[in-house]
From Swiss-Prot:
Residues 1-36 are annotated as: Disordered. Residues 22-31 have a biased composition (Basic residues). It comes from Arabidopsis thaliana. It comes from the Eukaryota. Belongs to the eukaryotic ribosomal protein eS25 family. This is Small ribosomal subunit protein eS25y. Keywords: Ribonucleoprotein, Ribosomal protein.
Length: 108
């Protein structure tokens, strides 16, 4: 049997990497500030009328959706939903401790 020859890897075309140079230190980024929303805490007549006409036409009604679209705060949105329920303009789809879902009242 002939002795084994040591295989030498072919020279690569890439230059050899130099030792780990000092990298630039990463700077701390400034935290993003959330924009403060200035929602109403009491209904004025215009917003109340808008609530009674537009909200029953929404396909999905939640306190967060009312708060966003009507520019009212969350507790006012929950009160508004209770009033719309009492008038029979909307109906409940699902209720959970943290989220209530309503929809427009249909004739069913």
């Amino acid at each position: 049997m002939a002795p084994k020859k040591d295989k030498v890897p072919p020279p690569s075309s890439k230059p050899a990497k130099s030792g780990g140079g000092k990298q630039k230190k990463k700077k701390w980024s400034k935290g993003k500030q959330k924009e403060k929303v200035n929602n109403m805490v009491l209904f004025d007549q215009g917003t109340y009328d808008k609530l009674l006409t537009e909200a029953p036409k929404f396909k999905l009604i939640t306190p967060s959706i009312l708060s966003d679209r009507m520019r009212i705060n969350g507790s006012l949105a929950r009160r508004a939903i209770r009033e719309l329920m009492a008038k029979g303009l909307i109906r409940m789809v699902s209720a959970h401790s943290s989220q209530q879902i309503y929809t427009r009242a249909t004739n069913t």
